[in-house]
């Protein structure tokens, strides 16, 4: 039986590819998709969800827009990475359907209530919507199987020296998620920076030759440009968000550890840092499964295999 999931995202090139991977995978039943502000403004990320589902001919999936800003802070966006639209590069279709007439939290709550079994929430943007759901609907916590997030890092950040972008945007929300008591799976930079797509991988996807694989290749063409900056030391572009979906599909591709994670919300230099108690120094019980390594070739092969679904 397919695993029911609820996808909360802020597309974003890698979010878009996570949507492509999820909807190409019969093991997953995508119940709804909600958008969060992050990689671009809330209006643009919502539009990008609708554009991607129009491309994939999945306008049957309910969509709702989420919070317009973080819980306690002004919004920061990553337009320097994802461009003016949030999905610069390919020519994507205009949406042919409208979002639901409700908020992201309302759609999430409805989805959880109506599901016969607990739902896995996959969150690939800032954690604002998920935190609002957890705070406003404590009675639904038991309907959440786990929360799989792309965010954080055990080591170095990518937005500040200490913080990864998604967590930095709304650290208070991320702290609510980690301390919720619900199982959390964290795909942080420690693993996503190893899940790099090289130029030859992009050409492999392009050669599959269907409209979706072509769009994915064009998304990667654009995404690679930002990551060519020599400061990163990358061979390709780290495909952060699809690691969440890939872990659900093939957990054997990933090495994980069970650790306690907290989020720094006050630090002068470390605001938004995910503090991972790697050596069990705090005495706190682990609250997260933290991904630390990935079989890069296996990850690329999975993407290539699933892109053939769209032939």
UniProtKB/Swiss-Prot annotation:
Hydrolyzes with equal efficiency cytidine or uridine to ribose and cytosine or uracil, respectively. The gene is rihA. The lineage of its organism: Bacteria, Pseudomonadati, Pseudomonadota, Gammaproteobacteria, Enterobacterales. GO terms for biological process: nucleobase-containing small molecule interconversion; purine nucleoside catabolic process; pyrimidine nucleobase metabolic process. Belongs to the IUNH family. RihA subfamily. InterPro entries: I/U_nuclsd_hydro_CS, Inosine/uridine_hydrolase_dom, IUNH, Pyrim_hydro_RihA, Ribo_hydro-like. Signal peptide: none annotated. Pfam families: IU_nuc_hydro (PF01156). GO terms for cellular component: cytosol. It comes from the Bacteria. Keywords: Glycosidase, Hydrolase. The active site is at residue 240. This is Pyrimidine-specific ribonucleoside hydrolase RihA. Its EC number is 3.2.-.-. It comes from Escherichia fergusonii (strain ATCC 35469 / DSM 13698 / CCUG 18766 / IAM 14443 / JCM 21226 / LMG 7866 / NBRC 102419 / NCTC 12128 / CDC 0568-73). The keyword DNA-binding does not apply. Transmembrane segments: none annotated. One of its GO terms (molecular function) is uridine nucleosidase activity.
